[in-house]
């Protein structure tokens, strides 16, 4: 699920933190990719007539088709992908996972009913909701990556957190995931839509954490508190607290402790905090996740030449893929992984840190922008009020 409405909040309050560009802009870069999120998106998106792709023996192959061709697309564009797989989820996440399982069960039942009585659109909608990534999907994707010569590692718990560690250490340029909570784990740069198909024509979103914090006027701890208020995988959200309210509460009170205190002491009882809401535990999971340090032996990785014949054996003979396409893909891998060894010019230079004066200037501009927005909203509200007060037919 990630963090609800976080992209919207950053887009509206820290637009300089987001860049949209073409996949070609990332030539020569190493990227750590959230594998489980990618596989889930492949299972949903790679379909034929509303159904997942199957081999002749009835095995699902959508995850392999997506992994093979989307990885090829990255390598064709000079990117060196590293996939990171989820480990065991933190205990605090078990409640959210239980809810997801229940929703899948409901969707499965609705899917069966739609097949009997519903429209094609209903069948497609509920079919997508039943999708879940299994151990078998993960194991087959790992086998495929090994044969392709693409490295992968297993995270102790959350893949996004491990991707963030590698990005902070400079072992990769960025972490790639659709989950915005990757920023909560302190990934300096988050790439979204990297594993989308070319047909979707979605630009790659590049989100810079330091610019987001500057634009929001927050430190990292406040940012995490904001994300918990917005709604994360570890806790159920506070009813009636949307993105604007969450942002206002953190800016006004500065921390979740003070937000909770203000809500509990509010005589109007406008918001009600859930009975079990261990926000401090959730914050701790974001601040100190269970990860391996970047210099750990299990975080060593390298790209190798594909094992062409073993790839053909697995994808063509076992899974029913087209042999010409698989061999063509293997040839592209061999050629383009060598090309991607070229260094980007930016790798020779270190970014210059902003001075205190520059930071103060940015904060001043941000505060001025906020004041302008507040003033505009007041004027709009006043104009609406005056328009309502006018009698009908009045000029």
UniProtKB/Swiss-Prot annotation:
It is an enzyme of class 3 (hydrolase). Mg(2+) 1 binds at residues 34, 86, 158, 160. DNA binds at residues 47, 70, 158, 231, 233. PROSITE patterns: XPG_1, XPG_2. GO terms for cellular component: mitochondrion; nucleolus; nucleoplasm. The keyword Mitochondrion applies. Residues 102-121, 348-395 are annotated as: Disordered. It is found in: Nucleus, Nucleolus; Nucleus, Nucleoplasm; Mitochondrion. Residues 122-253 are annotated as: I-domain. Its EC number is 3.1.-.-. Residues 341-349 are annotated as: Interaction with PCNA. Mg(2+) 2 binds at residues 179, 181, 233. Keywords: DNA damage, DNA repair, DNA replication, Endonuclease, Exonuclease, Hydrolase, Magnesium, Metal-binding, Mitochondrion, Nuclease, Nucleus, Phosphoprotein. Residues 353-389 have a biased composition (Basic and acidic residues). GO terms for molecular function: 5'-3' exonuclease activity; 5'-flap endonuclease activity; DNA binding; magnesium ion binding. Residues 1-104 are annotated as: N-domain. Phosphorylated. Phosphorylation upon DNA damage induces relocalization to the nuclear plasma. It comes from the Eukaryota. Structure-specific nuclease with 5'-flap endonuclease and 5'-3' exonuclease activities involved in DNA replication and repair. During DNA replication, cleaves the 5'-overhanging flap structure that is generated by displacement synthesis when DNA polymerase encounters the 5'-end of a downstream Okazaki fragment. It enters the flap from the 5'-end and then tracks to cleave the flap base, leaving a nick for ligation. Also involved in the long patch base excision repair (LP-BER) pathway, by cleaving within the apurinic/apyrimidinic (AP) site-terminated flap. Interacts with PCNA. Three molecules of fen1 bind to one PCNA trimer with each molecule binding to one PCNA monomer. PCNA stimulates the nuclease activity without altering cleavage specificity. This is Flap endonuclease 1. It comes from Aspergillus fumigatus (strain CBS 144.89 / FGSC A1163 / CEA10). The lineage of its organism: Eukaryota, Fungi, Dikarya, Ascomycota, Pezizomycotina.
